[in-house]
Amino acid sequence: MPKSRIMLDVLKGEAHFPPPLWMMRQAGRYLPEYRETRRRAGSFLDLCYDPDLAVEVTLQPIERFGFDASILFSDILVVPHALGRDVRFEEGRGPLLTPISVAEIMALESDVFHVNLEPVYETVRRLRAKLPDETTLIGFCGAPWTVATYMIAGHGTPDQAPARLFAYREPAAFQHLLKVLADHSAAYLIRQIEAGADVVQIFDSWSGVLDDASFDQFCVWPVAEIVRQVQAVHPDVPIIGFPKGAGARYRTYRQKTGVTGLGIDWTVPLAAAKDLQRSGAVQGNLDPLRLVAGGKALSDGVEAILKALGDGPLIFNLGHGITPETPIAHVEAMVKQVRSAAR
């Protein structure tokens, strides 16, 4: 059975051992070939919007490590950028946006949204043509809450206090922003699927900073709306949700959003992850710093996950993205350990 079918079967709730394997941010700065392509591209957004270069960097980790899945190289902030918002990336500072006002939120719309994102769709089409048949292609978007935090503050913050405060002070405007982002993100994922994505993932990197009521309003509801809209058009395409930092609310998130697979961060106890497997596939959850450290810290972490979760529906991954300082040899060691694992 081709490995692409194995990953899709895992997302249907089946167990396979060894599990399929890929890494968040697997096309990134830890790879010298990525750094060279990034240098040639100019700006980060130029790299995202150039299909030739975006395909090149997406394929680099597949060619080097043979991962079971390839994730489109892009960024969650192309959605606000395609909606006409100013987005730029500065070395050492990350993403910078012009903070959005209440009036701008209420007028937020673009009749050229898909035109602006056509280079991304072209990248997906080319990837599906170039990838090995056994490699699953993953499309993605950012969750409305996480994208909104950057649009409100204009940059990342430690606890996203600007967005939380804005949401409390301007609830109607904030809910409108989440609805606009949910609708456009769903349309974006649908186009990625139609271009060739086998699976899509929704990244909610800042879900862990919210209280219970806000988590339900700002994280769960918008993602549930995306899932509803995507499944109305493509009911058989799996959707992975990754609400990083959700803690005890992972179960509620899965139940209320309807996601197919659940990405879990490294803080989730393996006993809790095992319990989550009872309702479907989980993806994760190696601490990225174990991969940086290597040696026994790495092998013990991999072994613990495989032992606890390997007999259920598991997609082996990190609990967040790989960091730039990660040695390539450590990635090779992780891949070898997962692939050679025996029950």
Swiss-Prot record:
Substrate binds at residues 25-29, 44, 75, 150, 205, 320. InterPro entries: UROD/MetE-like_sf (IPR038071), Uroporphyrinogen_deCO2ase_HemE (IPR006361), Uroporphyrinogen_deCOase (IPR000257). Gene3D superfamilies: 3.20.20.210. Keywords: Cytoplasm, Decarboxylase, Lyase, Porphyrin biosynthesis. The record marks 75 as: Transition state stabilizer. Pathway: Porphyrin-containing compound metabolism; protoporphyrin-IX biosynthesis; coproporphyrinogen-III from 5-aminolevulinate: step 4/4. It catalyses: uroporphyrinogen III + 4 H(+) = coproporphyrinogen III + 4 CO2. Pfam families: URO-D (PF01208). Coiled coil: none annotated. SUPFAM superfamilies: UROD/MetE-like. It comes from the Bacteria. PANTHER family: METHYLTETRAHYDROFOLATE:HOMOCYSTEINE METHYLTRANSFERASE RELATED, UROPORPHYRINOGEN DECARBOXYLASE. Catalyzes the decarboxylation of four acetate groups of uroporphyrinogen-III to yield coproporphyrinogen-III. This is Uroporphyrinogen decarboxylase. It comes from Mesorhizobium japonicum (strain LMG 29417 / CECT 9101 / MAFF 303099). The lineage of its organism: Bacteria, Pseudomonadati, Pseudomonadota, Alphaproteobacteria, Hyphomicrobiales. The gene is hemE.
